[in-house]
C-alpha cells in the first residue's frame, strides 16, 4: 500500500506524464522513490521500452485524482491533447490541407513548459474566492501552505540535469523558430511553391526520425528490395524545386505529392511505401553496398548465382550507385558497387576455406541496347545470344578477362564505361540508353563455380523522356519496357519457385537466365529516386514497380493469388489467342505470358507493338547475317569468275566448260540474291507493321513498367 506522501499512486498503475517536447501520454509506475519524493515510470514507444523519473508535483498536476485527500488540489492545467496527437503515426495516403499562407507552422510555435508544476495561481484563486464572498474553513497549516506554496523539496541530480538540458533545448528551439520565420519571409516572395513547402515542413515536424545506420543488423533475403534517394542537384536548386521525399525510418519512404482540389485549394497526398531498406540522401555508396550487394558476395563462393541491379528514372543516380561518382562523362570507378564487390571477392579468396578451392576470377562487361548485345571490352563487338541443346544460354563471342586484383577490375570498368551508349535527355546531359551488365565469374579448373551479375539498367522513362519520337526512340522504349516487365516476372518466378520462368521474353532476362533458376540464387534491387517535385510522377512509378516486386516475396503462401494462364477457361484462352494473335515460338509464348499476367499494364495494342518490334529485330538479325554470308560468297564468286576469264585468254580453251561453269555461277548468284531480296522485302514490311502498330497504342494505357 502507498504511503501518505504518494497519495493514491501505486506500483503498476498508469498515470499521465508530460514529455520534454510537450507531448502528454500514459506510462506505468514501476517504483516509488521516497528519498527524493519521485516516481519512476516506463512506457513503450516505437517498439522500445523507455523510462523516466518524475517528481510528485508533476504527477499530481496531471493526475489530480491521485492527490492525497488532505492536500489541496493544484490548479487545473490545460487538458491533454486528443489521442490523435499523442502518438505520431505514419498514415498511408494522409492528406495535409493548406492553411493561410502567412500562418507559421503550429508545431514550431509551441514552447515546451517546465517539467515541474508551479503553484503560482493558488493565491489568486484564494483572493478570487474572498471577493465572491465565500467563507473558507481552512486550518492554519493549510492556510500557510496556500499562502507560501508547498515546502521546497530536494531535487535529484538527474532532475537538475534534465532541467538544464530542457532549458538549453528551449533556447535552441526559439532560435531555430526565429531563423525559420526569417527564412519564410525571404522565401515567400520568390518561391511559387512556398505553400506546399510549409505543408511538407509541418508534416515532417510530426515524424519520429530513425534513419538507417551502419549499426543496424543486415537481414538475409533471397530477394531484397531497397530504395535510395539522391539529394537535389544544381539544376533543381536553381529551378527552386522542392524536396518531396521523406525517409523517416530505415525501411519507410514517403512521397508528398502536391494536388489541387476543384476549388483550387492545394493539399498534399502523403503516400507511404515500405521496403527492406531505405537510404536517405546522406547515405554514401559504401553504406548502400553494405546492406545490398555485400551479402550476395558469399553466395557465389557457395556455388550460387547472385544478381544486383539498379532501377530508376534517368538522372536518379543508378550509374552513380553502380559505377561510382560521375562528373560529366568521367567517373571515379573506385567508389561504385562494381569495385566494392570486386574488392570483397578478392578478400574472400584469401580465406582458408575458399583458398583451397583454387578459384580463378574473370570479368565480363557488355551492354544490351535495343535488343542487341555488345561487348564493351572488345571494341563494342555485336554478340549473338543463343540457346544450346541443354537449354543453356550462350553469349557467343563474349570475352572473359581474368583479373588478379581490384586494379584490374577498375581498368575494365573504365574501358567499358568509355564506350557505353549514352545520349542527352531532359533529365541528364549524359544519360545511359542501355542496360550495362558487369559480371564477376568464379571458375574452378575451367568450370563455372559462381557468378555475380551487377546491372545498371537504362532509365525506366526512356521511351517518353527524349526530344524525338523516331523509330530508334520507339525501339529503345519498347525494349526497355519489355525487359523491365520480364525482369519483374522472372523475380516473381524466383520468389515463388514457379516451374516456368519467362526469361525468353527479353534479351536482358535471357542472358541472366541462370540467375533466376536454382535454389541458390539471390537477387537485390536498388530503386533510385529523384527528390524533386518535378520528378514526382516518375518517382511514384519507380516506387510502385519496386513495391510490386517486394509484394511478391512478402507472403510465400500467396502463390495461389497469381493469375496464370490456367485460371482462364478454355474458351477464354481461345479468345485471348485470337485477340493477341500470337505464334508458337518460345519467345512469343513468354511474351504472351507476360502480357496475360499484366493485363492492367499492357493493352492488346501494346502487346501487338511489342510483338512487331520483336519480329522486326529477329528479321533484322537474319537479314544482316544473310547479307554478310552473301558478301563472303561474293568473294569466292569473284575468284571463280577471274579463273574463267583467264581461261578465255588461252587459244584453245574449252568453250562448253566455260559456258557451263559461268551458268552455274550465275544460277547460284540468282538463287542466293533472290532469297536475300525476298528477306529484305519482308523486313521492310515488318518495319511498316511496327510503325502502324506504334500508332495504334492507346496513350491512356499505363506504361508497361
Curated annotation (Swiss-Prot):
Compartment list: Cytoplasm; Cytoplasm, Cytoskeleton, Microtubule organizing center, Centrosome; Cytoplasm, Cytoskeleton, Spindle pole; Cytoplasm, Cytoskeleton, Spindle
InterPro entries: KIF2A-like_N, Kinesin-like_fam, Kinesin_motor_CS, Kinesin_motor_dom, Kinesin_motor_dom_sf, P-loop_NTPase
UniProt KW Coiled coil keyword: yes
Annotated ranges, domain Kinesin motor: 222-552
Biased composition range(s): Polar residues: 122-139
Phosphoserine: residues carrying this PTM: 75, 99, 134, 139
A GO biological-process term: cell division
Modification N6-acetyllysine, positions: 101
Protein name: Kinesin-like protein KIF2A
A molecular function GO annotation: protein serine/threonine kinase binding
Lineage summary: Eukaryota, Metazoa, Chordata, Craniata, Vertebrata
Subunit structure and binding partners: Interacts with AURKA and PLK1. Interacts with PSRC1. Interacts with MCRS1; the interaction enhances recruitment of KIF2A to the minus ends of spindle microtubules which promotes chromosome alignment.
Keyword field contains ATP-binding: yes
Originating species: Rattus norvegicus (Rat)
The family this protein is said to belong to: Belongs to the TRAFAC class myosin-kinesin ATPase superfamily. Kinesin family. MCAK/KIF2 subfamily.
Coiled-coil intervals: 153-186, 659-698
Positions where Phosphothreonine occurs in the chain: 96
Keywords, in A-Z order: Acetylation, ATP-binding, Cell cycle, Cell division, Coiled coil, Cytoplasm, Cytoskeleton, Developmental protein, Differentiation, Microtubule, Mitosis, Motor protein, Neurogenesis, Nucleotide-binding, Phosphoprotein
Gene name per UniProt: Kif2a
Amino acid composition bias (Basic and acidic residues), ranges on this chain: 158-185
Domain of life: Eukaryota
Annotated binding of ATP, by residue: 312-319
